[in-house]
Amino acid sequence: MDSTELNRVFQMFDKDGDGKITTKELNESFKNLGIIIPEDELTQIIQKIDVNGDGCVDIEEFGELYKTIMVEDEDEVGEEDMKEAFNVFDRNGDGFITVDELKAVLSSLGLKQGKTLEECRKMIMQVDVDGDGRVNYMEFRQMMKKGRFFSSLS
């Protein structure tokens, strides 16, 4: 992931745009994704990432976290984590991410990208290997391993 993509992902979490991700912002972002994490666990996550000790995560700390995750993913992708991420997008549980489901998740995250069905259709087309107009788990997994999801948000 290049610095532009990293900034884009960081901004998804940095809701107020002050250059720092707080526990509250992290909590809100996860809730928007349908992931509930107790506040004490979120605090622990931030403490592990927070190198400068200010209680927040800045872009450099976020970048280091991302590098760590990507190195671990290259060695051994956590299948459970990958399925959990897929299920966030596959809202009806049918095993496919549709244009409508992608739009709903991106909207819930408050992203500028994917506001129209046409934008979401283009994003799906970028990773839809079998051409059925939806993303199955294997296509999603390949996309995530290659880091293509965040580049498709450009």
From Swiss-Prot:
Residue sites binding Ca(2+) 3 per the record: 90, 92, 94, 101
SMART domains given in the database record: EFh
Residues at which Ca(2+) 4 binds: 128, 130, 132, 134, 139
UniProt binding sites for Ca(2+) 2: 50, 52, 54, 56, 61
UniProt GO cellular component terms: cytoplasm; nucleus
Domain EF-hand: residue ranges: 1-36, 37-72, 77-112, 115-150
GO molecular function: calcium ion binding
Record key words, sorted: Calcium, Metal-binding, Repeat
InterPro entries to which the protein is assigned, alphabetical: EF-hand-dom_pair, EF_Hand_1_Ca_BS, EF_hand_dom, EF_hand_pair_protein_CML-like
Pfam families assigned: EF-hand_7 (PF13499)
The UniProt record lists the keyword Metal-binding: yes
Record: residues binding Ca(2+) 1: 14, 16, 18, 20, 25
Record function comment: Potential calcium sensor.
Similarity comment: family membership: Belongs to the calmodulin family.
Protein name as catalogued: Calmodulin-like protein 6
Organism encoding this protein: Arabidopsis thaliana
